[in-house]
Design a protein with these regions (language model features):
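Long hydrophobic alpha-helical segments that form multi-pass transmembrane helix bundles
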Residues: 135-282
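Structural signature of hydrophobic alpha-helical transmembrane segments
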Residues: 54-67, 104-113, 215-225, 265-279, ...
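Membrane-interface helix-loop-helix junctions at boundaries between adjacent transmembrane segments
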Residues: 90, 95-174
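N-terminal signal-anchor module of multipass membrane proteins
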Residues: 2-72, 76, 421-422
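Cytoplasmic-side transmembrane-helix entry/capping segments in multi-pass membrane proteins
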Residues: 82-93, 109-115, 130-140, 241-252, ...
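Alpha-helical transmembrane segments in multi-pass membrane proteins
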Residues: 37-45, 60-72, 89-94, 98, ...
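Loop-to-transmembrane alpha-helix initiation sites
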Residues: 132-137, 278, 332-341, 362, ...
Length: 422
């Protein structure tokens, strides 16, 4: 099969058949099935985006997805290869691009971003499976510098909190809209003042695991212990008998009821990009991808845990250049739930084309990206580091694959050539 046409060709005698470029699947799952499953898994986050940002969330998302489909079809026509937009990969890139943009951007911002994603980051490298970097994130970086006043704002709009229910869907967060209120994102507030009181962080109240609100303290801890045992049993059954439903159900119940906190900051009712604000919605979609084995759970787990650990133990540089030293549980919660970490962990760093092939490599890849994200958040001038951390990690993927791929039986790794004396 050729990389773009997908048409079978009979190999000459003694010549091996060339198959499609990655991603390769061995479970009877096609690329369109995987891509459209990802689109469905993004629907919970999209629904939250509609509620938080009004109808413009749908406007930007549909425009971005349609632009990616249109640009990819046009470029494939110009290249003289088969148009493959029905596989859903362009739709996934378009939705993810919209999810990392504010809902208030002008119409041309996602259109230009879609061209960069499809034309430069994807088709210029040969199309699906040949790109080295995540197309949506490449476009996001370009837009950040091309339209800084629309993409990097000091204050971000959301529909006013006093508007409730379905009435929020009819409201607009366009510049100057009377239906919108603006404020800094949780990470921006934390970046400017790492020692800020917890109550000063947008969306911080009320806050706590669901069990803490539903049950008395003693009963909550008892149920939490049962959830831990349930999750451990599920992981054991998945590892020994392949019972992935047990693992996903056990870990999912533990996360949703005992770990991931409630509150505006985790439900997504805070300023930010369209699809990144709700940790709960993204976790639901991510667990679905894990269940259907569209992604390897080790990679998002390694990424999130690395960011959480480093945010807990490393000193933080404040906006005035001073260092804030000391552990803060609330500061760690903001780093985990107050930005784009869950969106990047479940839907971007797990891209099959730009992530390593082996489980060991994916763990290493997640740690590398997590270290980069934490360092950017804590010490660079930009409050969010997910986008850059994943792109930088994408550049290390060939090396990670080389170091973690198992050695073929009966072969040896090629030794480096000896340097001449003198």
């Amino acid at each position: 099969l050729t990389a773009e046409s997908g048409a079978p060709s009979a190999p000459a005698p003694g010549v091996m058949r060339v198959v499609r470029v990655s991603p390769h699947r061995s479970e009877g799952e096609s690329i369109p099935l995987i891509m459209w499953t990802v689109v469905l898994a993004l629907l919970p986050a999209f629904a939250v985006g509609l509620y938080v940002f009004g109808w413009r969330a749908a406007y930007v998302t549909v425009l971005s997805a349609a632009s990616c489909v249109g640009w990819e079809a046009l470029i494939q026509k110009l290249r003289g290869v088969r148009v493959t937009v029905a596989d859903g990969s362009a739709v996934v890139s378009g939705v993810l691009l919209a999810f990392v943009l504010p809902a208030s951007v002008s119409w041309y911002v996602p259109v230009v971003g879609a061209f960069v994603a499809m034309g430069i980051a994807k088709q210029a490298f040969g199309g699906l499976g040949a790109n080295f970097f995540n197309p949506a994130l490449v476009a996001r970086v370009f837009l950040q510098f091309a339209f800084p006043s629309q993409v990097n704002m000091p204050e971000w709009p959301i529909v006013a909190p006093q508007v409730t229910g379905l009435a929020r869907l009819a409201k607009s967060v366009a510049p100057g809209s009377p239906d919108a209120v603006t404020s800094a994102t949780p990470l921006a507030v934390l970046k400017a003042n790492p020692g800020a009181a917890w109550e000063a962080i947008p969306g911080s109240q009320p806050f706590g695991p669901p069990l803490a609100w539903l049950l008395p303290a003693g009963a909550a801890w008892a149920v939490f212990a049962l959830l831990v045992a349930f999750a451990a049993a599920g992981i054991y059954l998945e590892a020994t008998r392949g019972k992935r439903l047990a693992a996903v159900a056990g870990v999912g119940a533990l996360l949703l009821f005992g770990v991931v906190p409630t509150g505006d900051i985790s439900f997504g009712l805070v300023p930010g990009c369209i699809g990144e604000t709700s940790a709960w919605a993204l976790l639901l979609g991510g667990l679905a991808l894990v269940y259907y084995r569209c992604i390897n759970w080790r990679l998002p787990l390694a990424y999130i845990v690395t960011v959480a650990v480093l945010a807990s133990v490393l000193p933080t540089r404040a906006g005035d250049g001073s260092l804030v030293v000391g552990f803060s549980f609330e500061r760690t919660l903001v780093h985990v739930f107050g930005g784009g970490l869950f969106l990047g962990a479940f839907f971007m760093i797990t891209d099959m084309v730009t992530s390593p092939l082996t489980s060991k490599g994916q763990v290493a890849f997640g740690v590398i990206a997590g270290v980069m994200a934490a360092l950017i958040r804590l010490y660079a001038g930009y409050p969010e580091g997910v986008c850059y951390s994943i792109l930088l990690a994408n550049a290390t993927r060939p090396l990670v694959d080389r170091l973690t791929m198992p050695t073929v039986f009966g072969s040896r790794r090629r030794a480096a050539p000896a340097r001449p004396a003198g």
